[in-house]
Amino acid sequence: MTTTTAGALTALGGQTVSRETINLLHYLQIRFTGAGGVAIDPSTIDGNEIEFRDAAGTLVSLPAPTRVGTTDVFRYGLSADLAAGRYTITILGGSFADVNGIANVTETETFTLVSPTAALTDPVRGQVTYVDEFGTRGYVDITFTPAPGATLNVAEILALRPTFSGGGAESLTITSVTRQGTSNVFRFAF
């Protein structure tokens, strides 16, 4: 059986993707495929063919799509940045057709957006450290983990000058940031 689908979703379907990558693009692209690989009827793509939902199941409003050239790819703009979480795209059955008039079937795909993370490595998170001891040690180590498919922006991390809070830490000033070898651990000296 041959059906009309939105096949390009499977490239993203089930994947974990960098939130920042999607938010830099400010759009999602979907390639619609006709039955047996024939072209779709582009006049049947009007923005009412998909439902896009965030992790809470809330419908995310999308404007009518823009066709990319003369292809079967359509671009759906994003009016706001997407938060980290699992998203669902449902292509509604019967909402578009190929040039032979064969309507599509319902298709649902999901993808997860994640952000890079930073975690205190030394001292270990939750470790009790006295103010005097902390002040004389002169540094903290922080491990940065990029989102899947992304790399760390080392120059940006080296330029960071975070602030500390808590008993006595308010007067600390970061004097240098160094990468520990080729790892994702950075030492913030004060």
Describe the residue ranges of each PLM region.
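Aromatic sugar-binding surface patches on proteins
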Residues: G69-G77, G181-F190
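Extracellular/lumen-exposed scaffold segments
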Residues: G94-D98, E170, G181
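Hydrophobic residues positioned within well-ordered beta-strands of beta-sheet architectures
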Residues: L28-I30, N48, F74, I89, ...
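Short, surface-exposed alpha-helix to beta-strand junction/turn motifs within ectodomains of secreted
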Residues: L28, V38-P65, G149-S176
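Extracellular ectodomain surface segments
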Residues: R19-V38, P42-T44, V131-A147, N153-E156
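Hydrophobic residues in beta-strands and at strand termini
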Residues: F32-G36, L78, I91, L113, ...
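Acidic, Ser/Thr/Gly/Pro-rich low-complexity segments and short DxT(G/T)-type signature motifs
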Residues: M1-H26, L59, D81-G138, T163
